[in-house]
Each structure stands twice: as C-alpha cells, then as structure tokens.
Amino acid sequence: VHALCDAVLSACQLGDIGTFFGVDTPEMAGASGIAMIEKLRDFVTAKGFVINNVSLQIVGNQPKITPRRDEAQNVLSAALGAPVSVAATTSDQMGFTGRGEGIYVIANALVIAP
C-alpha cells in the first residue's frame, strides 16, 4: 500500500506518503490500507488527475504471492478505481529478502494529468 500510494503521488507530483499521510492527519492513525488508498484516490481525482493503472512488483521469498495474486489485484483495483497488477519475484537468495528478513515493493503508476 505504501509503495502504491508513493507511486501515484509521485506521478502526480504531489509529494509522497509521508507528506500526504503525515502527522497532520491523525484521523488516519491505524487506518486500513484500503482506507488509505481510497483517500488517495479521492485526493488525486479532486486535483483533476485520472489514475490509469498501477503496477506492483513484490520482491521476496516469503510469503508466496501467487496463491492470492488475483484477490490482491481485485481488492486494490476496487479501492483505487483503476487496474492494479501484482507481480512477484525473488532476489535469488541475495540480501535481506534472500535471507527471508523482509520484502520490498517496486511500484509504477500511470496517471493522466489535468
């Protein structure tokens, strides 16, 4: 969710997730990822942007993404109001992801400016 939000905000030149959901938005403390995406969607569309699509690539060994890929794509797409694709890969046992210590996500967003 963080990578998705950062990608959309960056593509719109509207800052990043820290700027948008910073300490000045205490109402978002503890909010679900879906609530964050919906608030982001409403904000960028109010600015006149159209979110065309978002691509997420998850890098890590665990958890396995494929069994729930379709579910993730459907839930994220519904919240964003635009197609979200999810791909997964490993880092061939290299680095912190290869040691199973975490994952990272690369996100790209295509938006149409007003």
Please describe what each predicted stretch is:
Residues 64-66, 92-95:
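Short, active-site-adjacent cap segments at secondary-structure transitions
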Residues 1-75:
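RNase III-family endoribonuclease catalytic core
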Residues 97-114:
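C-terminal edge-of-domain segments
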